[in-house]
Amino acid sequence: MHLTSREQEKLMLFLAGELAAKRKARGVKLNYPETIAYIASHLQEAAREGMSVAEVMQYGATLLTVDDVMEGVAEMVHEVQIEATFPDGTKLVTVHNPIR
């Protein structure tokens, strides 16, 4: 199987997001890279499942709270931006202040 660079990035993001989700489920507070991976992978999946851009942006702001991340991480994450594949093509999705 041959994967393009973009496909490899998406796969790595998915794997990092899965690891972060498992840690979150066990009650482990997420660090910065885990936080970004968790949010980004959920945004990718939401877009793939057919949500609109606006719905994905709103959804992204509901995924994590300050209690889910290590101290200081919420203040470091001002936005999460991804290129997501929607049924009608690839679009840029930005979630501002995703940890509330």
Curated annotation (Swiss-Prot):
Matching Pfam families: Urease_gamma
An MF annotation (GO) of this entry: nickel cation binding
Functional pathway: Nitrogen metabolism; urea degradation; CO(2) and NH(3) from urea (urease route): step 1/1
Keywords on record: Cytoplasm, Hydrolase
Descriptive protein name: Urease subunit gamma
E.C. numbers: 3.5.1.5
Biological process according to GO: urea catabolic process
Chief location category: cytoplasm
Organism: Haemophilus influenzae (strain ATCC 51907 / DSM 11121 / KW20 / Rd)
